[in-house]
């Protein structure tokens, strides 16, 4: 009988439980449970509902029992940078504030009193983003110093769910690197940096690598769901899992992990922490097996998702793509990475305002708005591809687009045209596939990453755009 492996993949807008197993030499997936996610306002702060989300994680486990497909292991992956602080009784200190909250405004200046941006990049190789853990912790230090005094443990979001499942406190490496407090040389916390910033050392747990067994379900969870399994750390940063699932058998490719965010980059063995890399705003996030994801964060499909919500989700993404294609000659462009698009009150109005401010034709219809966003994204991808080639001295022949955004056919066509490269789109479920792959590698279903990627290609295929 085939062994089942469970990926719990929680994104910024939804979470899913996806079961995977091997059948006739191919990986087979089944989504068995889905739930909503999103930030809510609490005490004037944008917060995640972790208690509710954990109930949903458990509900999905109960569903496994219900359908008679009990996994041998599971792992949770989420977005990066966000965390909880626990006191000595393992209670959460303060609100579970999310990365789109404004509490980090001005915190970069506070950090730079201790270390310059240039030196910080040289130490960590992580691109500056106001929501990084390093700045969020500074916000806690300035606004709630008592939390840092009481804190015994810092856990990033997937680590917190693994703790609630098993009672074991761990910090997984790929997720930790997103926060800008890990050394790419030692692949451990940069304790000297942590001391410089006045963050308590004791909060930071030992880092573990993806593929590490964390433990079995706690008695409480086991009784509730009716079975036991091993919790295995995948690359818990969702992009780390998605990149593991890129269906390539060589290194002649750029990838885009396309979802709420677009993470565009390459895999490399060593980090590039040079001044030029810093100026170009590339980041060196941790990957599976000690590799680095050398990439750039691009706003991604967040803009389209927001616009869709503003018309009450009346249209599918495919329908919006079709409308955009009809308005394809609309001339205006926006900078997809402009801060104004990070958390606006109304994305549609923000796009119009940007065009107004920059003296361009203002889009009016949904199709025009969508074509401005898609075309701007494709041009941003083309610019980033050129920068990657400049930084590495290489020319890449193709771009692999994985994740939910790989289904946006119109955007893929625009990207092929803008980059003049072959686009290989798929698999759409890359994050869950990568999560399951890390578990399968631990269980020796595959011997190497290369074998796993070949099987992923054979199992799910790709759609090529030229």
How should each PLM-predicted stretch be described?
Residues 70-78, 153, 206, 394-403:
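Short glycine-rich phosphate-binding loop at a beta-alpha junction
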């Amino acid at each position: 009988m085939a062994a089942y492996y469970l990926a719990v993949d929680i994104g910024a807008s939804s979470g899913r439980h996806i079961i995977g197993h091997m059948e006739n030499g191919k990986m087979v997936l089944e989504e068995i449970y889905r739930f909503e996610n999103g930030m809510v306002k609490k005490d004037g702060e944008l917060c995640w509902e972790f208690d509710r989300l954990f109930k949903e994680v458990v509900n999905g486990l109960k569903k496994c029992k219900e359908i008679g497909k009990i996994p041998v292991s599971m792992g949770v992956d989420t977005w990066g940078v966000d965390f909880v602080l626990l006191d000595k009784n393992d209670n959460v200190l303060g609100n579970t504030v999310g990365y789109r909250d404004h509490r980090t405004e001005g915190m970069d200046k506070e950090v730079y009193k201790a270390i310059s941006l240039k030196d910080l990049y040289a130490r960590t190789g992580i691109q500056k983003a106001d929501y990084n853990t390093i700045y969020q912790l500074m916000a806690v230090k300035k606004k709630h110093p008592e939390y840092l005094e009481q804190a015994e443990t810092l856990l990033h979001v997937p680590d917190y769910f693994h703790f609630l499942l098993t009672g074991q406190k761990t910090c997984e490496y790929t997720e930790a690197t997103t926060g800008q407090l890990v050394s790419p040389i030692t692949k451990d916390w940069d304790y000297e940096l942590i001391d410089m910033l006045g963050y308590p050392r004791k909060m930071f747990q030992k880092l573990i690598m993806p593929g590490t067994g964390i433990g079995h379900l706690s008695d409480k969870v086991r009784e509730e769901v009716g079975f036991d399994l091993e919790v295995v750390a995948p690359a818990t940063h969702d992009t780390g899992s998605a990149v593991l699932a890129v269906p390539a058998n060589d290194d002649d490719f750029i990838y885009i992990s396309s979802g709420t965010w677009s993470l565009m980059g390459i895999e490399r063995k060593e980090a590039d922490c040079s001044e030029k890399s810093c100026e170009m705003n590339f980041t060196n996030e941790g990957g599976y097996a000690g590799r680095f994801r050398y990439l750039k964060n691009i706003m991604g499909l967040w803009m389209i998702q927001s616009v869709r919500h503003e018309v009450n989700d009346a249209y599918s993404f495919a329908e919006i793509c079709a409308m955009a294609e009809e308005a394809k000659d609309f001339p205006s462009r926006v900078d997809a990475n402009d801060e104004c698009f990070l958390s606006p009150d109304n994305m549609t109005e923000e796009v119009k305002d940007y065009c107004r401010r920059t003296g361009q034709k203002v889009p009016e219809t949904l199709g025009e708005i969508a074509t401005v966003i898609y075309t701007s994204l494709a041009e941003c991808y083309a610019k980033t591809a050129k920068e990657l080639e400049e930084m590495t001295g290489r020319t890449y022949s193709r771009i692999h687009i994985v994740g939910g955004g790989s289904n946006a056919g119109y955007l893929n066509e625009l990207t092929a045209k803008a980059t003049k490269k072959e686009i290989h789109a798929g698999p759409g479920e890359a994050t869950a596939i990568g999560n399951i792959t890390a578990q399968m590698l631990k269980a020796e279903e595959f011997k190497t990453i290369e074998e796993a990627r070949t099987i992923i290609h054979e199992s799910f295929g790709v759609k090529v755009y030229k």
